[in-house]
Every structure is written in C-alpha cells, then in structure tokens.
UniProtKB/Swiss-Prot annotation:
Functional summary from the UniProt entry: Forms part of the ribosomal stalk which helps the ribosome interact with GTP-bound translation factors.
Pfam families per the UniProt record, alphabetical: Ribosomal_L11 (PF00298), Ribosomal_L11_N (PF03946)
Modification after translation, per record: One or more lysine residues are methylated.
Organism: Mycoplasmopsis synoviae (strain 53)
PANTHER family: 60S RIBOSOMAL PROTEIN L12 (PTHR11661), LARGE RIBOSOMAL SUBUNIT PROTEIN UL11M (PTHR11661:SF1)
Protein name per the record: Large ribosomal subunit protein uL11
Complex and partners: Part of the ribosomal stalk of the 50S ribosomal subunit. Interacts with L10 and the large rRNA to form the base of the stalk. L10 forms an elongated spine to which L12 dimers bind in a sequential fashion forming a multimeric L10(L12)X complex.
Gene Ontology cellular component list: cytosolic large ribosomal subunit
Family membership: Belongs to the universal ribosomal protein uL11 family.
Gene Ontology molecular functions: large ribosomal subunit rRNA binding; structural constituent of ribosome
Length: 193
C-alpha cells in the first residue's frame, strides 16, 4: 500500500553540510535524521550546492531525491567567476570552451528533460548566455545557424513573392486579352447599329 504524502519540498544545501534550521522546520521532517542521511549521501560531492526533493509522509517518514548541482554553479566554476553579469546583453562576465559546455551538459543530463547531449548543450548554453558567459565556439555556431535560418527564410519569401508576381502577370495577360476581345466585340456591335 502506498504511503500518504503530507508534503513535498524542494530545497538546496551544500553537499555534506546540511544542518537543522528554519528551511527544514517548515517541511515537517525529522531534522537530525534527514541531515545525517543527506550528509552521508552527499559527502563525496565537495562543496557544491545540491538540490534535493524531500517527500514527507503522514507517518512522519521521508524520502529524498538528490539532483545535480545547478548549471549556473557549474558554469561559474568553469568560467572561474564569482557571479554572472548584471546585464548579460551588454557585459560578458566570462567565457567557457565548447568542451566545458559539453562536460556540464553531460553532467546535467540526468536532470534535464532530454536524452540528447546536443539538446542539453543548448539548454546549458542558454543558461550561460543569461549569465553573460560566452561559450567559445558554440556562440559562433549558433550565430551561423541563425544566419542560415534567416537566409533560408529570406530566400523562401523571395521565391514566394516571385511566384506571386508571375501568377499576377499571367492573370493580367489573360485578363487583358479578354478585355480586348470584349472591346472589339462591343465596337463591332456599335458599328452595326
């Protein structure tokens, strides 16, 4: 029989350093028991922040699921910066290489909604962009792909416009011939009368 869930909470602690406190008090979990279990499970992860989902059941037992460190943490670590840019559009806070991007994407893959490394790289690259971190080699590829997409759209629009003009030209030619025929017939009628 499945246990009745009382509460589900998502929190984040430093690996191996969770302590009883206000963030856990609101969850309703046995704090010493949870912190011991969490710290034992994350001790080997250094000082990285570890997101955790805690499910507390009505009988006061609990389960928890650990996630990978946030992509922003890994990006800051790779770029050797303390924080991202306050204005990512105008200020570059740092850079990472394409290899570092791939490593972070592969690390984050279990927590992302994709199984494809390239899609994961795009997700992590988006996070890096929001932080003002440039990905050497990737941003150039992304710009080239975007330019190709825009060029294809422009070519498609030009082709559609050309076809539209051609069909309009044919309609005009066809209608002009009819108008002339009508005019000739009407003039012949007027002359007969």
């Amino acid at each position: 029989m499945a246990k009745d869930v009382q509460k589900v909470a998502k929190l984040q602690f430093l690996a191996g350093k969770a302590k009883p406190g206000p963030s856990l008090a609101g969850v309703g979990v046995n704090m010493p028991e949870f912190t011991k279990a969490f710290n034992d499970a994350t001790r080997d992860r250094g000082d990285e922040p570890v997101p955790v989902q805690i499910t507390v059941f009505k009988d006061k037992t609990f389960e928890f699921k650990l996630f990978t460190a946030p992509a922003s943490y890994k990006i800051k670590q790779a770029a050797k910066i303390q924080s991202g840019s306050k204005n990512a559009k105008t200020t570059i806070a740092g850079t990472i290489t394409l290899e570092q991007l791939k490593e972070i994407a592969e690390y984050k893959l279990p927590d992302l909604n994709t199984d494809d490394v390239n899609a994961a790289m795009a997700i992590v690259a988006g996070t890096a962009k929001q932080m003002g971190v440039l990905v050497e080699g990737y941003d150039d590829v992304a710009k080239a792909k975007q330019a190709a997409i825009e060029a294809a759209k422009a070519e498609s629009l030009a082709k559609a416009k050309k076809e539209s003009l051609k069909s309009q030209e044919e309609e005009l030619k066809a209608s002009k011939g009819k108008a002339i025929d009508v005019n000739v017939i009407e003039k012949e009628r007027e002359e007969k009368e």
